Curated annotation (Swiss-Prot):
It is found in: Cell membrane. One of its GO terms (cellular component) is plasma membrane. Its main location: membrane. This is Uncharacterized protein HI_0120. The chain crosses the membrane at residues 15-33, 41-57, 73-93, 108-128, 129-149. The keyword Cytoplasm does not apply. Pfam families: DUF2301 (PF10063). Keywords: Cell membrane, Membrane, Transmembrane, Transmembrane helix. The keyword Magnesium does not apply. It comes from Haemophilus influenzae (strain ATCC 51907 / DSM 11121 / KW20 / Rd). It comes from the Bacteria.
Amino acid sequence: MADPHIKSPMDFLDYLTVIIYRTGFVIAALAVLTVSWYPDLSLTFILIAATCCASSLHIYLKSFRLLFQFATWIGLLFYINHYPALALGGALLTLGGLCFKEYFCFRVPLLNLQPIFVACLWFSWVLNNLIALRIFSIISGVLLLVLAIQKWRMPLHFDIGDKTKYQI
């Protein structure tokens, strides 16, 4: 997690990856909100969102960074091999985990429970429970949207923090 009080020098790739990361949350919010109405299209965009976030992740601890990146990669592999439920699970693991991380920056109410909400969303998808899917897609989508708005309101360097703390 970045230290907002530290402003490390940023190059073009730093700016680009922060923009990609934040855009991922916008895409995720819209895709999750529509998942019960347009499941195939939403799944594609949820995977795109998770890829944006995981590919451009600025987190100090290498183990968590790799966990979120590999969950997304595995989700993408399941997607191209026609296992949509498992693909969705990998993407939601990444997005839910990142929301939990971001909770400690913003203290958005209920954001720390996002991993539980996306797990319920996933189970609703797998069990084909449309009512539960709509409920959890609205809860998760709104939380992602609030997070996306909060992220875009702050300076880009807040996502980077102290570059000397990153585990390589």
